[in-house]
């Protein structure tokens, strides 16, 4: 009697963690349904930093953030809050510590980034020196 063993091949679609994503622009939502309010996070991953916008359509609240990816979280977050400016042409930002963002229950979207991301990228630009 001859017994043959063969390796079982398991194919699983593994979703990469935020830390393992290549540099680029991304969008995630807490719901794929378009007929109800949702939370959406748009971000740019560059080197070891993630800069983006966290916007909740249910509450109308949104903020800009910058942090470091760790597994499926963004940690060491700094948030940027837009403050009134004397001139309409210049946006001023107030920086404050923020809470980590977890992506375990968020879904990636194929669509590219929106205007909120580009606004938030300017909040964390280094100041120009004369």
Residue ranges and their predicted role:
Residues 13-37, 128:
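Tryptophan-anchored aromatic micro-motifs
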Residues 26-32, 51-57, 78-80:
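Short beta-strand segments that buttress and anchor functional surface loops
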Residues 1-3:
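Sec-dependent N-terminal signal peptides
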Residues 69, 74-130:
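Beta-sheet ligand-binding and adhesion/scaffold domains
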